[in-house]
Amino acid sequence: MEASATVERAAAKDVLTIREVLRETWHDTYASLLPETAIETITSQWHAPALLADQIQNPDIYFAIARDGGVVAGVVTARKEIDAIVVGRLYVRPHHQRRGIGRQLLESCYRAFRDAQKVRLTVEADNRKGVAFYTKQGFREVARSSEEIAGARLENVIMEKPL
């Protein structure tokens, strides 16, 4: 099913709803990959309302939401780094997935940084849905990395797509 969502820049009034979207999708995506305590620690730190509000206000960060039927269904953040768009986060609520909303959010990043030559992102290697989605969007693996977050070890795939 194709999306009927509208993508718009996030506003300060959206912070609590954005936090809810991020928490919901993090729990859905990572429940089988990370301990619950790690998910709670990460979501409380990375998705703190003050941090999200600062990112929304930062002119160097593209922060957008997708509304589907009036409901915030997805979130994307990106920034420009030399000739590349670096996607920091892209999450779509579980019951809104497979409708083209993720693609719409990605494409909005391309429009926000029209002079970029490529787009880069990092996805957890065991996040099969995420890796499959990005592969379908034309991304290819260019490197791997690992990191420890909240006591959990994550193996990451760094993916790029030429524009």
Where do the PLM segments sit?
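Short, contiguous strand/loop micro-motifs
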Residues: 39, 117-118
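Acetyl-CoA-dependent GNAT
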Residues: 5, 9-13, 19-97, 106-112, ...
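Basic/polar N-terminal segments that are highly enriched at the extreme N-terminus
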Residues: 1-2
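Conserved G/P- and acidic residue-centered "switch" motifs that form tight phosphate/ATP-binding loops
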Residues: 100
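Residues forming the Rossmann-fold NAD(P)(H) cofactor-binding site
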Residues: 103
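C-terminal "cap" of GNAT-fold acetyltransferases
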Residues: 55, 118-131, 135-163
